Swiss-Prot record:
It comes from Xylella fastidiosa (strain M12). The active site is at H176 (proton donor/acceptor), D247 (nucleophile). The keyword Nucleotide-binding does not apply. Pathway: Cell wall biogenesis; peptidoglycan recycling. Its main location: cytoplasm. GO terms for cellular component: cytoplasm. Plays a role in peptidoglycan recycling by cleaving the terminal beta-1,4-linked N-acetylglucosamine (GlcNAc) from peptide-linked peptidoglycan fragments, giving rise to free GlcNAc, anhydro-N-acetylmuramic acid and anhydro-N-acetylmuramic acid-linked peptides. GO terms for molecular function: beta-N-acetylhexosaminidase activity. SUPFAM superfamilies: (Trans)glycosidases. The record marks D174 as: Important for catalytic activity. This is Beta-hexosaminidase. The lineage of its organism: Bacteria, Pseudomonadati, Pseudomonadota, Gammaproteobacteria, Lysobacterales.
Length: 335
């Protein structure tokens, strides 16, 4: 199955045609799709109306520099700021993480979008792509935050996606533009990078997004291409039973693996449930790749639309203004 990207703030005839294909499980929204809060509500409704089946709508709304919806939404602080508070006041930091998660998830759901791919539970160890998106460099601190964030998102009625498994934070390279290789053995990864994922899974995380990183002392392929990582370690040893997403196949770290068709097949053959095709110019090739493959749409049913929530209802919720105020007082963020 595929989650695809669309080009703009309204749907083209070709994009409506893509949505008729059984292989299209949903749409990932980006800043290019955003003009205003009202427009996102309209686009979400138009996407659902155009599709002949339930459609999963997703976005990256982490806070900080990765926030696709902005005007009319809370300016969420990056997770690193919340992590820094943990040293002084762990209880207050974990409460803020819960509230950050609730606020983010509530605003996204009020816009008609099912989920934000969050939280990042990579370790903050200097990776160019992760940076301040990570809570901390300490696996056990990140594990505590992972559990609080899962609880906050679930309290808002949103499913949770832990990313980027098995950990993107301990390599320097940004997989958007480079191949990344982590040469540490599995024993080290299990005692460090996998700790937050185990905590998030234990807390009830619904999905995991794979990293486009190679761990050659565990498996020769990037993690998203690796049945060993997905089936043996994630589903086998760690007992994860939820949805497995690839990261975007347009990223440089996987671009050379058999083109779009080869990349899609490699992810699905390894055990990914859903492949992200975020660049519209790659969608036709991706659809050609999955023609004839069986689509397991049941895997995503639990991620779609957990009850109705609109902006009027959210704005009337007393928690909304109070949480915004607390985050503003601590980090200077606002709408």
């Amino acid at each position: 199955m595929l989650l695809i990207g669309v080009a703009g703030t309204t749907l083209s005839a070709q994009e409506v045609d893509w949505l008729q294909d059984d292989a299209v499980a949903g749409v990932v929204l980006f800043k290019r799709n955003f003009a205003s809060r009202a427009q996102i509500v309209e686009l979400s409704a138009a996407l659902r109306e155009a599709a002949p089946r339930p459609l999963l709508l997703a976005v990256d709304q982490e806070g900080g520099r990765v926030q696709r919806f902005y005007e009319g939404y809370s300016a969420l602080p990056p997770l690193q700021g919340i992590g820094a508070l943990y040293v002084r006041d762990p209880e207050a930091a974990l409460e803020l993480a819960f509230e950050h998660a609730w606020l983010m998830a509530s605003e996204v759901r009020a816009s008609g979008v099912d989920l934000s791919f969050a939280p990042v539970v990579d370790l903050g160890r200097g990776n160019r792509a992760i940076g301040d998106r990570a809570f901390s460099d300490d696996p056990h601190v990140v594990a505590a935050f992972a559990q609080a964030y899962v609880q906050g998102m679930h309290a808002a009625g949103m499913p949770v996606t832990l990313k980027h498994f098995p950990g993107h934070g301990s390599v320097l390279e940004d997989t958007h533009v480079d191949l990344a290789v982590d040469v540490r053995p599995l024993e080290t990864l299990e005692s460090e990078d996998l700790v937050p994922f185990a905590a998030g899974i234990a807390a009830g995380a619904d999905a995991v997004m794979m990293a486009h990183v190679v761990y050659p002392n565990v498996a020769p392929e990037t993690a998203g291409f690796s049945a060993h990582w997905i089936e043996v370690i994630l589903r086998g040893r760690m007992g994860f039973r939820g949805v497995v997403f690839s990261d975007d196949i347009g990223m440089a770290a996987v671009r050379g693996v058999g083109g779009v068709v080869g990349c899609v097949h490699a992810h699905l053959d390894a055990g990914c449930d859903v492949v992200l095709v975020c660049h519209p110019e790659l969608v036709n090739d991706a659809l050609s790749a999955v023609a004839g493959r069986r689509s397991n749409t049941a895997a995503l049913i639990g991620l779609i639309g957990r009850g109705a929530l609109g902006w009027d209802g959210l704005l009337a919720d007393v928690r909304y203004g109070s949480i915004q105020s607390r985050l503003f007082e601590r980090f200077g963020t606002s709408t």
